[in-house]
């Protein structure tokens, strides 16, 4: 599969770090370092616009090392880049850590994962007819316990 990209001057294409990687690294396209205070959210540009084939999306996900070591997360994970979007890909990062984190120019800040999309047809049933019954029913939010 090919994703056509338009790059701002000095921006980098997404790049897979290893042969078996499912996520391609996205880099910060910034001129100066940006300090992210604990609890703060920032919007970081990548300098990339993508032409994603119809029937696919690009999911923006956190980098595990940034999350574990520094508490840096992609807030709306996974973020979705739709096939019909043509604007710059920007990453919403949040610092859930205890110290200020510095985003450096060209730093790998997130991963892009290409995934197929299925658009469903949504229909309505009246409440008398209802949904089909399951053993789970409407139980959620930890109903199976912690162990």
UniProtKB/Swiss-Prot annotation:
The keyword Transmembrane helix does not apply. Pathway: Pyrimidine metabolism; dUMP biosynthesis; dUMP from dCTP (dUTP route): step 2/2. Its EC number is 3.6.1.23. Pfam families: dUTPase (PF00692). GO terms for molecular function: dUTP diphosphatase activity; magnesium ion binding. InterPro entries: dUTPase, dUTPase-like, dUTPase-like_sf, dUTPase_trimeric. The keyword Transcription does not apply. Its cofactor is Mg(2+). It is an enzyme of class 3 (hydrolase). Substrate binds at residues 63-65, 76, 80-82. Keywords: Hydrolase, Magnesium, Metal-binding, Nucleotide metabolism. GO terms for biological process: dUMP biosynthetic process; dUTP catabolic process. It catalyses: dUTP + H2O = dUMP + diphosphate + H(+). CDD domains: trimeric_dUTPase (cd07557). Gene3D superfamilies: 2.70.40.10. It comes from the Bacteria. PANTHER family: DEOXYURIDINE 5'-TRIPHOSPHATE NUCLEOTIDOHYDROLASE. NCBIfam families: dut (TIGR00576), PRK00601.1 (NF001862). Belongs to the dUTPase family. This enzyme is involved in nucleotide metabolism: it produces dUMP, the immediate precursor of thymidine nucleotides and it decreases the intracellular concentration of dUTP so that uracil cannot be incorporated into DNA. This is Deoxyuridine 5'-triphosphate nucleotidohydrolase. It comes from Chlamydia caviae (strain ATCC VR-813 / DSM 19441 / 03DC25 / GPIC).
């Amino acid at each position: 599969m090919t994703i056509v990209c338009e790059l701002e001057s000095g921006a980098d294409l997404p790049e897979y770090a290893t042969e078996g990687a499912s996520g391609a690294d996205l880099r910060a396209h910034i001129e100066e370092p940006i300090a992210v205070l604990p609890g703060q959210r920032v919007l970081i540009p990548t300098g990339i616009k993508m032409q994603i084939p119809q029937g696919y999306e690009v999911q923006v996900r956190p980098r595990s090392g940034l999350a574990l070591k520094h508490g840096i997360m992609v807030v709306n994970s996974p973020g979705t880049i739709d096939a019909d979007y043509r604007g710059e890909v920007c990453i919403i990062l949040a610092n859930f850590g205890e110290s200020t984190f510095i985003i450096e120019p060209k730093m790998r800040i997130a991963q892009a994962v290409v995934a197929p999309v299925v658009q469903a047809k949504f229909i309505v049933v009246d409440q008398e007819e209802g949904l089909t019954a399951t053993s789970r029913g409407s139980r959620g939010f930890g109903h199976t316990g912690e162990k």
